[in-house]
Structures are given as C-alpha cells and as structure tokens.
Amino acid sequence: MDVHTRWKARSALRPGAPLLPPLLLLLLWAPPPSRAAQPADLLKVLDFHNLPDGITKTTGFCATRRSSKGPDVAYRVTKDAQLSAPTKQLYPASAFPEDFSILTTVKAKKGSQAFLVSIYNEQGIQQIGLELGRSPVFLYEDHTGKPGPEDYPLFRGINLSDGKWHRIALSVHKKNVTLILDCKKKTTKFLDRSDHPMIDINGIIVFGTRILDEEVFEGDIQQLLFVSDHRAAYDYCEHYSPDCDTAVPDTPQSQDPNPDEYYTEGDGEGETYYYEYPYYEDPEDLGKEPTPSKKPVEAAKETTEVPEELTPTPTEAAPMPETSEGAGKEEDVGIGDYDYVPSEDYYTPSPYDDLTYGEGEENPDQPTDPGAGAEIPTSTADTSNSSNPAPPPGEGADDLEGEFTEETIRNLDENYYDPYYDPTSSPSEIGPGMPANQDTIYEGIGGPRGEKGQKGEPAIIEPGMLIEGPPGPEGPAGLPGPPGTMGPTGQVGDPGERGPPGRPGLPGADGLPGPPGTMLMLPFRFGGGGDAGSKGPMVSAQESQAQAILQQARLALRGPAGPMGLTGRPGPVGPPGSGGLKGEPGDVGPQGPRGVQGPPGPAGKPGRRGRAGSDGARGMPGQTGPKGDRGFDGLAGLPGEKGHRGDPGPSGPPGPPGDDGERGDDGEVGPRGLPGEPGPRGLLGPKGPPGPPGPPGVTGMDGQPGPKGNVGPQGEPGPPGQQGNPGAQGLPGPQGAIGPPGEKGPLGKPGLPGMPGADGPPGHPGKEGPPGEKGGQGPPGPQGPIGYPGPRGVKGADGIRGLKGTKGEKGEDGFPGFKGDMGIKGDRGEIGPPGPRGEDGPEGPKGRGGPNGDPGPLGPPGEKGKLGVPGLPGYPGRQGPKGSIGFPGFPGANGEKGGRGTPGKPGPRGQRGPTGPRGERGPRGITGKPGPKGNSGGDGPAGPPGERGPNGPQGPTGFPGPKGPPGPPGKDGLPGHPGQRGETGFQGKTGPPGPPGVVGPQGPTGETGPMGERGHPGPPGPPGEQGLPGLAGKEGTKGDPGPAGLPGKDGPPGLRGFPGDRGLPGPVGALGLKGNEGPPGPPGPAGSPGERGPAGAAGPIGIPGRPGPQGPPGPAGEKGAPGEKGPQGPAGRDGLQGPVGLPGPAGPVGPPGEDGDKGEIGEPGQKGSKGDKGEQGPPGPTGPQGPIGQPGPSGADGEPGPRGQQGLFGQKGDEGPRGFPGPPGPVGLQGLPGPPGEKGETGDVGQMGPPGPPGPRGPSGAPGADGPQGPPGGIGNPGAVGEKGEPGEAGEPGLPGEGGPPGPKGERGEKGESGPSGAAGPPGPKGPPGDDGPKGSPGPVGFPGDPGPPGEPGPAGQDGPPGDKGDDGEPGQTGSPGPTGEPGPSGPPGKRGPPGPAGPEGRQGEKGAKGEAGLEGPPGKTGPIGPQGAPGKPGPDGLRGIPGPVGEQGLPGSPGPDGPPGPMGPPGLPGLKGDSGPKGEKGHPGLIGLIGPPGEQGEKGDRGLPGPQGSSGPKGEQGITGPSGPIGPPGPPGLPGPPGPKGAKGSSGPTGPKGEAGHPGPPGPPGPPGEVIQPLPIQASRTRRNIDASQLLDDGNGENYVDYADGMEEIFGSLNSLKLEIEQMKRPLGTQQNPARTCKDLQLCHPDFPDGEYWVDPNQGCSRDSFKVYCNFTAGGSTCVFPDKKSEGARITSWPKENPGSWFSEFKRGKLLSYVDAEGNPVGVVQMTFLRLLSASAHQNVTYHCYQSVAWQDAATGSYDKALRFLGSNDEEMSYDNNPYIRALVDGCATKKGYQKTVLEIDTPKVEQVPIVDIMFNDFGEASQKFGFEVGPACFMG
C-alpha cells in the first residue's frame, strides 16, 4: 500500500494509554467505504480521450499546476458532438445508487442553456438530467414518476453559463439535493422522490443534450464523475479537483492517457485510468519508505525522520486555520496530536472517513467544534468539511482518556465500524509499522488534568515549513479552564435527516414552449469491411454486438414518434449496421471492368436432353485434365482421320484379337481438336470404306470372355503391326485420361449441330474486340418495346421540307410565355354557352388597334380544316428543340454499306428471353478426331503391360449393344463445343468443379434482349456529320410573336379562297359611301384565306340577307350604345366550325389583300376597279389552312407594302407529313451562309427515300467551294428593280405578328367601282358596335362570311338543340413511352420446318426412374439391324459415350412434369426496376442510439445520381463518305435583304423546267443589324468563328471567304443568351433565379431530379418573391411547406391549466400555427393562393403523442366524440364528423394505455383547407393524462 500521508505525533493522549494500538490497527486495517464508491468517469466511458467528432483538446481549469509540467487538460465540446453510452457502462455490476454525487469541472458557453448529461430509462423517459445555464435545473424522476416536472429542483440566482470555469458538485441524499458551487456556495433543495427510488440502468446516457432538444451543450469540460456516495460532493475541491497551487491527486482529471500531461516521472506514469485512492495502509508498510504506485513520491522519506517531534504537546491540538475555498491545504484535526500534513507531491487522503462524516446520531444538536478533540483519525481525518458533533457535556477528553475502548469507537459510528473491526487484533501487531520512537507516546505518569487553556492563535503552517522544537517537560495538570472561544465555523455538514415535507408551493408558471426537437442521428461509423466487391459485411462479433446495443438503445429510447421532422444535423459516420434483408434488385449497372476469374461453380444436375445447338466456334486447346478412371468401352465412332503416330505408351494387358478391318483411306493428318461435350446419340452412319489395318481395337462385345490367363512377363515392345480391321464392339471401358492437346489441325467442315448444352454460367466479359465491319442492313426486326427516351440528341440537319400536313389536334399547353407588357390582366371568364346569333349590325368605324390583351380562355377546337395549298417556304427559324419522335416513315431503298463505326460499349445484360422455337436440323459435321487411347484397365488383375501400338483409324460404328450395367462414374471430361440450349433438366448432383477454360472467340450476336432500364443520360456525344435529309417533321408549335413590323404596302388582291374557320370579328369600319351595285361576278370557288390586308374603306351597306339558320345563342339583350374601343384581344384558338349561314348583306369592299396562296388557274373574273387604299389593320391570327381553292376571279393589283421587320424565331415544330407538291415557287433570295456546324459522326446511310417534289429552279450561283456557312453579311445596297417573279410556292403560314401601330387614316377615296369580293381576311378583334347607318340598297349576295369568334360571355341562353356528332379527331400525338413491360411469355414455337428424312431413332423419352441393374449377360454377336421397335421405357443414364453424329431434329416433346425444386441457383440477373412506390411520409426523428463498432465494408452503393452534363466531346473523325442521295429540294430562302425599290409589274411567265440544284451562291449582302441584348463576352468569345484560311483554300475557292464584322460576335452572343433564357423559361431549374411554378412542374421538366429543396414561384412574374420548398418527386412531385419552429408541436405534458375542448391558440403556451419555407421565411398569402390554384390536392400529417388520452377513436366506446378537431386555412373546422378526408394512419391512442401515438393524415382535394392553423384537444385534464403533438409539413400535389 502506498504511503501517501505523513504523521506527526503530538499526542494528546496520556502516555501509557493502552488502546491506541488496537485503534490504529483498526483504523489502518478498516477498508474505507469509498471502495464501494469508486467514481464512474463519464468522460472515459464516452471515449473523450480519443477525440470523437466535435471534441477537441483545450486548456483546463488550471493553466499551470504545481508539480505538473503543463496545464490541466480539458475538452472542448461543439455542436457536432453526439455522444451517448449505455448506462450499464457506468454501473456494470450494480444498480444505480439511491444517494450519489455528480461532480464536474466545466466552462459552459456564455448565455447557453443546455443539459450537460441526461440519463434515460429503457422506455426513453429521462430519469436524471443536469441543466447548465441561468437557474440550473436538476431533473430527477424515479421509477414511480416522482417528482413531477413542476417539482424538479430549480436553483435560482445561479448562473452556470457565464463563460467561466466552475467546479460543480451535486449531492443527492434522501430527499434533498445540494448544489456546491466552486467549493463555497451551497444551496439545498427538497427532492420529492419516493423512499426507495430506483433508476433504470438499462437505458442510455446522453451527453450534452436531451433527446429531441435543440439546445446542445457547448463549452469546455475537464471532469464529469458519478460517485455512489452523496458525501463526495463535499470533498470535490479536495480530492478530485483541487486548486491550482496543489498537486493533482493520483487521479487523472479527465482520463487523458497522455503520460506527459500530468506525471513526468516514475515507472507507471500515465497509467491510471480509473480513480484509485489509497484509503487504508498495510501495517507492514508503515515506517517503510513508500513504494511508488502511479508516480514517485520524492518526499516520502520524510515520514521516518521525525523522532524528536513526538513529545506530546497538548496545546497543539488546535486545528490548522481554514484556507479560503479549500485552497489546497487540509484543515485536519487529529485525535491527540496526530496531525495530517499533506505531502508536497501527493494529496490522497481518504475522502470519506466515517468519523469525519458522522451523521450526528449521538448528539445532533451540538454545535461543531473542530478543536474539541472529539475526532479520531482514521487514515486521515478531514474536518474541513466535517459535521461531527462535539462530545456531549461531561464526556470530554477525560472520558476519552479512560474509556477509549473498542466500544467508544463503535459508538462514534455504529453503522460503520462493526463490519471492519477485528477484535482479535493485538497491540503487538502494530510494532513493525510504527515509527522508531513510538514508545515515547506512552511514557510518563499521568498527572491531574489541568485547566483548559485559552485557545491559541491559529498557527499558519505551510507544507514543509514546520520546524519542531524539542519536547518540553510535562506540566502539572491545570484546573479546568474556561470554555474556549468559538472556533472557526466549520464547513457545512451533510444534510440532516429529512424534515417534514413543507407546504406545497404555488404552482409555477408554465414555461415557454420548447423548441422542436432535432432529428438525432445514430453516430455510427462505417469502417472498412471485406474486400471490394464482397456482397456485404460478414456477420461478426462486432455486428452482433452492434445489434445488441441497437436493440438495447431501441428499447431504451422507445417513445412516441413525432411527425415528419426537419432533417437533422448529419451525425458522424457510424459503424455499419447489421446485414439487411436482401434488397430489391438494383438497376443494371454499367459494364464493369473484367473481374478476376472466379472459382468454378458447382456442377448442376444433368439437364434434360436439349435440342441440337448450332456449331460453336472451334475453341482453343484446353489444358490437360487429370487422368480419369477407365470407363466402359464406348461404341465405335465413325472412322477418323489418321492421326500422328503416338508415342509408345505403357503396355496394356493384351486385348482379344480383333477382326481384321478393311483398309480405309488415309485421312489427313490433323491436329487434335478439343473433345466436345457428349452429343445425342446419332443415327447409324453408312459404313465407311474399309480402312487400313489398324492396331488392336478395343475389346469388342462379340466374343465370350475367354478364360483368364496367367500374368505373362513383360515383353519388349514389338514393331507396330499392320492396321487390322476394327474389332468387334467391346463393352465400354472406363474413361481414359485426357491426353495432352494435339497441335491444331486444319479447320474441319462444320459438324452437325449438337444438342444444346446446358446454360453455362455467364463468363467474364472479354476484352473488347476490334470493331467488325458494318453488316448489311438486315430485314426489319419485330417491333421492340418502346424504349425510354434517350438523351437529347444533337440537332440534325434540316430535312426535306414536307408538304403541309393536316391540322393537328390541340397540343398540350405550352410553357407560359413572356409576360406581356401591355394590357391589364383580366379575370379569366368561363366560356359561356353560345348565344343566339344576332342580326348583323352595320359596319362601324374602324377602331385603332389596341394593345394585345392577355390570352383568353381556350375556345373549343374547330373542325378539321381541309387541306390547304402549300405556303411559301418561311425563313429559317432558330434552332428549336428536338421534336418528338415522328411516326416511322416508309422504308427507303437500301443504302450502301456504311463505314465501320466505332464499337459501342457493351450494353447491360438483358433479361433472358423466352426459349425460341427449335431450329432446323443443321448440316452434318465432320467426325471429330478420336481422342488418345486411354490406359487399358483390366477387368481382372493387370498383366504385364505391352508396348502401346500406333493408333489405328476408328472402325465403323457398330450397332448399339444392350445397355450395360451402370459403371463407376468417370471423371469429368473436357468440355465439348457448346450445344444449343437444352430444356431445363432435373437438378443433377453437384459435380466437382472443372478447371476454367480459356476464353473463346466472340460468339455470334445474340438475340436482342428486352429493353434494359433506362440508363442515366450519358454525356452528349460529338455532333455527327450531316446525315441524309430526314423525313419531314411535324409542324412546329406556334412561336412567340415577333416585334411589330412596319406597315406593308398593299399587295394586289389575292384570289378568293375558301372560307376559313370563323375568326374573331374584325373591327367595325367607318360607314362608307354607298357604292354602285356591281354586277355579280361568276362565283369562284373559295380560295384559302390570304393574310389579312389593310382594312378598306367602308363599302355601302347592303340589304339584309335572308335570315340564316338559328345560330348558337348569342348574348341576350338589346344592342347597347357604342362602347369605348376595347383593347385588341389576342388571337383565340380556332373555334368549332359553325354552320354556314345564308349569305348576309354584302359588306363594304375590302382593301386588296396581300398575295394569297396561288390557286389553280381559274376562269378570269371580271376586273374590278381599283379600290381606295384603306387603313392597315393589325394582322389577325392565321386561320387554319383551307382546302385548295378553285381558281377565283383575279383581284386588282395592290401596291406592294414595305417589308416588315423580321419576327422572333419560333420554336421548331414537329414536321408534318409531306404535302402535295406545289407549283414551282419564285426564285428565293440568296441566303446568307450560316456558321459551320460541328462535324458530326457519320450516320448510317438511310434507305433511299422517295424523290421530293421538283422544286423551283434556283438561281445559278457561281461555283464556289463548299465552305463553311458564314454569318449574315451586312446590309447591301438596294438591288435593281426586278421583274415580277413567277408565283411562288405557297409557304406555311407565318407566325402572327404582334399588332403593328395603326397607320395614318387615309383620305376618303372616291367611290370605286364594285370590285369582286376579296378573300376573307382573318378576323380582327371585336370592335365596338357602330351606330346604325342608313339602310343601303340591296347589294349582291356575298359569300358566306367567316365564322366569328365566340362572343363575350353573355347571360346563359336557352339550351340549344343537341348538335350533330363531330368528325372524329385526328389521332393524338404519340404518348411518352411507357415503362418497359415484364418479359412476355415464351412465344409459340415457329412454324414447323420441312420434314426431314425419317430418323431411325425416336425422340428421346422422358428420363425414367433408375432401373435395377440387371445381371450382366454374355454379349451376343451383333445382329442385323431390326425393324424399329417401339421406344422402350427409359433406362438409367449410361455413362457418357463417344459423341455420335447429330441426329435429325425430332419433334418437340411434350413438356414433362415439373421437377423437384433444385438447390438454390446463383442469383438471377437483376430484374426490371419496379415502379416507384409512393413516397412515404417523412419519418419522425428516431431516438439517439449507441455508438456501435465499425462494421465490415458495405455493399457497393447504388449508382449515383447523374452527374452534371459534360462538356462537348471532341470532334469526331471524318466518316466514310456516304453515297450521294437523291437531289434534295431547294433550300429555304435566305434571310431577307433590305427592301429594294418597287419593281415594275412583270407578266407571268410559263413555269420553266426544274433545273439542277445549283452550287451554293456567294454570301448575300449583310442583313440589317439586330438589336444587341447585352452580349455576354464569354459567350461572344466562345462563339467567335475562327476560319482558317487554309481550310478555305483546301476546299476550293478562297474568294468566298467573308470577313465577319465585329458586331456579329455580339449578335451571336445575344442569340445564344436569348436561347439560354428561353430554354430556362421552358425548363426551369428550380433555383432562386430560375424557379419553377411547382414541384410538379419541375418534375415534368426534369424527371431525373432527386427529392430535395428547390425554389418555386407559383405566381410567376419576378422571381424575387420565390421561396424554397421541399419537393417530393418520389411521391409524384408534391410541393411541401413546413410549420415554423413554434408551430411544430408541443412536448407531451399534462397541461394542468388548460381546459379540454379549447383550441391550441387559446392555450397559455399556444398559438395559431404558421408555416414557412425551407429557409424559415414565411410564405406569402398570394404565393400560397397561387400554389393552391395550381394544386389538385393537398395533404398534411399530425402526430398526437398521448398518455391515456384519446386522439381520434375511443376504442372503449367505439365513438369519435373526443376526436381532435382541426381549423383549416379557410377557417373551416374539420373532424371525423364532417370531413371524410381525415384518416388515422396509426391510432395507438385509442386504447388509452400508456404512452402511445396516433398519426392523422389530412389528404383532401379541398386545397384551401390545408395547411391547418389550429387544433382542438378534447381528452385531457385528468391526473394521469398527458399529450403532446407534432405538426408535419403541408404538401400540395399538382
């Protein structure tokens, strides 16, 4: 035992007192009680010294400490720390003590309020907690639930989070808890716990927080101890955390294993990890020099060097003075003069001596007098904290002198000494351990007791400074002195007995609602595991331990789960979990690198005989296999080619002589081929020509076995004999050994197809072979399943312009366009029912074009228009997005073979397809070369082996003999050629694994597997070279309107087209003069409507036409006065074709329209006089294409208008089907050369398409080099006046431009002659009704007018009669591909092939049961072949025979019965990915678990999310030039040049013949400069076209090179940025700058986006009011907002001051629930309104945590009277009785048993009800009832 204290003997006992040796023996031997109070160091349990995540080392309480080299070590704890451990690690072998101390040295972050430590029971209820901060709380709840939360001890007026170090000691004793702060401030509180409280140690301890608390302890900590003794708290500053001028006791302060931190000398430095205190000393060690235990004690020798100091000095029994705050000096009073003097190096007194801590049973009311000499030292007596009473009156020192007996000591503390005192101890036993001068203690004669002297002044004794004088003579006994002055006040004693309970205090005010809990993550670390590629961690001790800890933690933390919480802070990486259940098959991964050759798998059971397979490629020679046992002799094979002469083998036993065979032809000497797998037994072949005499043949079956001869001596090898005839067929011998492979022979003829072999395991992927030559185009395969859409491809070259297609059905709503500048946003009106047709009003004055209004509601679809004349080719638009896949075109002619492409990467292995039909019989293969002869086995004992003769040729095949008895199983033979796939056989026994074969050459391409799962999009490939023109695409969607062009001059009136669909009513023109009635012209067929011309002057008012049939009901009411001119509305969609009314009155003569589509030449109409030029009206929307009109009367020529500005590019539409060829168009302007495209890969040459219609002859350009297309040139000079061109080909209707500014009103023209009716222009916007004009004279009957647009919604009219059924609509667009279906069932077998020649054998029967082995009969002579017998019952499988020739293909057998299930096969290929299940609700945060051990390496993770799009790849190599295609149609006209002066009118010339396609002309003059929209310099520099002059020269004419102007870069940059902006408008990214409207919208644009947080802007417009939401794409694209922190719920409590049936907002701690976005910002009302408008349904979860409280159904009564009620956002109350959209996902509270939870889901189409804003609780208020709740996010589904 270490000696850690020094004794100075200044005895107050009288010399000769006899009881001291027994007393000392008792005191020195008594094991102190604190052995049972070993401190439990929580910092060690939590592994602080290994610095887990969030823990770092820092300087502790003392920056310098006496006798230490460096400062104290503490640990800094940050928010990232997540530390927990099972409580049993603190108390592994005992229960948690009833009375205990918590000791800690800590510096909390200033202003923080968090729990330092929390202990939970197995159910997850907190039992003990210490909260640091202002007014710290000691949380304690025993097994009975006492005290309640309102009775937790609260230490007011104390601030533990002031940023300073504090030494905190908490003593829990009986029903009191005492907090001792910094060794001086002591506060005791009542702890209302049960008499025998129990703390469950089956839970966990959590450091630094509470489960679900958001507050986390932050600061520095040096010590955290639990001591199973309540008295330890009073000694904290002496024994555990002394002041800085005191050496550290033999205890590490925070379990730091660094030996240099505290102790720097001795053998055992740094070894103490648990506190070990020397509570008693061994008597044998007394007086000896101390032995160092954990560190040396240099001053220990002083203990034996004080012999002269032992003279008793009674006056020195006064205590040493107290030093402030226990500053490292012990104020110990010894009994007599045994004073405790602390060593300089060690400071390890016994912390809890029973004499020091007497409970005061003898005299509890006496004041404490430390100097009264009433204390008896045990190893050291510490009175600085003692609470001992003084002896009772009359029992002072005299009593001690005479009665210092064993009984006296016992009486001082009966509870303590009895168990330890040994009555057998004798004084003699103490001798060896006492100091040398111990006899002086007993010398002298006791005189009478003197008076007690005055109390002396306290001595100031510093350690090591005490100088002792010589002992003085003993004075006479004095009279009893007067009472001494009151000694210094002792430190506060232990708490006394529990007093009577005080009156209950007033209930405290409810605290503020706690913040929502964070999601605690189990901080497991995942360590390394098995080798890469292993399936998962092997089950290990670590894993089972982790499972046990997890299970324990789950039990410890099982509590009511909350609703979906916010994502918690990521925890540290934890250890791996236990192996999970096997997951769903993952997606097929990409082709991995070639793996290491795996071990051979076990052989499967033999399968049924399969069908014959096609010939496999000749394999490489196999390795030599082990020698097999001898098999039975097989049947003789067909004669083989002559082999090389073999080496002489060991002599075998002589066989019976064979018959001489005829000599056969010599075969070619070939190398040995690989033996094949056994094929099916073939037919008997024709007898071959006689072979040359062979060597002795194998034993035949014909002869009877001869008598066994004696073993002869071994003969010398004889010369090779003549080749004999093949011997008779012998019994099958044992299988011979496989010989070494021979040299490779010439390739044989293809053999007959063998039966298909069993499916082998998939081989390792071979290296990629060189790319093969591209094969010719095969016949089209069957339609495969629709694949997933591929990644967006590079834009293809412009295809041949097709003819105008028929009008498609209404497309899906496009993305919202730019928000228009003009127009007030009108409310969207519903489409009213059509009113009755009103009378035609007079034409009013033309109104000015108003600004475009917002788009109106969609009108009903119009009838399908007739096919119109093809329009003129439009200008090339900007590159649009790739159109959807068109319908497949007609196959063209076969193209030439393309160049060799680069090999593609192997695709993922497809699923196994169904078994195909059985193939026809293949050609007969050549007979394989016989293998080497095996060693002869002897049926009898082997004779001397003879020399091996040369191999003879194989004889002809004999007839099959009778089936022999089954022989012993042979060893595995070499693998044969692969046969065709056989039917699945019965499971064979597992054979030994064969050696791996070499990789064979690449086999033929297999059948196309089913479509694999959609892969992640690869990086975009390099653009391919321009392929052949593709088929015409569908018509593109309508582009955005271009900027308003300048008003054009009037064109000549077009031919009258057919009436178009009814357009919007045009503006009412001003009243015109009445014109003369013109003679009615011959009615021409209606032409297609031309573009709207300028409005003409008002014509005369015609007479009213005959009443038309009843039109759709119009707005009722009288005609109003003229209203103010409204803004021009946008073009509506085409309306339904209304019935054609009777001709109305003739309208005013319209202005000449622009050139209409050219109709076929009709009869000339009467020429009208030229009309006055009218005002230019705004162009109306283009009507649907009308049918090709018959030639109408020709109109008068109008003035050509000025050219308008070019509109914005529209998106490229899907190309429509090819139209009819139009007449040749005019020669277009030479287009500007475009920029050179990137070189694309050579496409496969497509089939030759049909030649396009002949285009008009283009101008012959100067033969230039095929240079890269240049940028648009600058504006050129106006050209000379050209002659009038020929009528051009009708182009597709152009995009409607925005309304141009109204032109100046023209002068009223003279009255013109009555002209022919002009073509109906597109309807203009509805103008205000004009005043009634004077009634005109009847005009000619006009053509039926265009149908007007739907009028403004009027009051509902009477229901009209039902209309006729409309024409069937056109087929819709191709839907998006559906998911890949499961593999279909096996198809039926193909058609049966032509019958083959009848085979001699029937088809193989089913495998029969194994027959009994028959007795072996003597082999008979081979008989003649008999007639074919009926198939016998199947015998047992014989041994493998020599492969026979392949037989004819038999008919397919009927399927056999299902075999027994085989053993588990290897894992199948991954199945198709299942449909995504609906995303579950976000789970409630789990409780914190324990840190487990690191696990094995986990399985390879799933494929990650697609990476960002890669940059464009390098330009590909030039492909092989394809064959020239047919001459394409003319390209589109170039960009328009500046308008030239008006040319003279030319006459129409005849159509010329189609010219050859000319070479590209020189670049046209530059076009007008466009507006520069903030060019992006990066893009500008990126889009700079650098043209290498050498390229141009290489290509030919260099003079075509045009130097770009500097401004072109800006134009290209602007175009590029515009393109990006438009792309982002169409496909928002969900960022703050580019938000989507809803998550559903985002999912539609980006189906691959993962769940997460994205920005949305439901009201669109400026994105500054966008907000971040959680997008749950897994659940279909729902948009989720979250309750704010204070609305997330409330902790479970009893709510004593609240009334049932009240709303939560009425609670004292309640409020209305409010919601925020994912960044915590409130969501605006307008945005929520729009979000609801964009949503079809919404859902939200509420979790109710209960303790004996009902949330929904009351299971006892079956009623819902106490169900929660919710207040929706629309102030609607919702509960079980009035809302069917609420359902309970979990209703654990219905039973009212213990802690449970109920999860309610509100999933409603009434989106205005969600989110909920208040909750009414109805079942609480009783003493045992508690509840809490959590509110989940509100998610809206579009």
From Swiss-Prot:
GO terms for molecular function: extracellular matrix structural constituent conferring tensile strength; heparin binding; integrin binding; metal ion binding; platelet-derived growth factor binding; proteoglycan binding. This is Collagen alpha-1(V) chain. Residues 258-269, 396-406 have a biased composition (Acidic residues). Residues 559-1570 are annotated as: Triple-helical region. Residues 1609-1837 form the Fibrillar collagen NC1 domain. It is found in: Secreted, Extracellular space, Extracellular matrix. Changing residue 25 to R: In EDSCL1; not or less efficiently secreted into the extracellular matrix. It comes from Homo sapiens (Human). The C-terminal propeptide, also known as COLFI domain, have crucial roles in tissue growth and repair by controlling both the intracellular assembly of procollagen molecules and the extracellular assembly of collagen fibrils. It binds a calcium ion which is essential for its function. Residues 231-443, 1571-1605 are annotated as: Nonhelical region. Changing residue 229 to N: Risk factor for cervical artery dissection. The modification 5-hydroxylysine is found at residues 627, 642, 687, 708, 744, 774, 795, 804, 807, 810, 819, 846, 864, 882, 897. Residues 377-388 have a biased composition (Polar residues). Residues 1-37 form the signal peptide. Residues 444-558 are annotated as: Interrupted collagenous region. Residues 470-485, 687-696, 1106-1115, 1380-1398, 1454-1469, 1526-1541, 1560-1569 have a biased composition (Pro residues). SMART domains: COLFI (SM00038), LamG (SM00282), TSPN (SM00210).
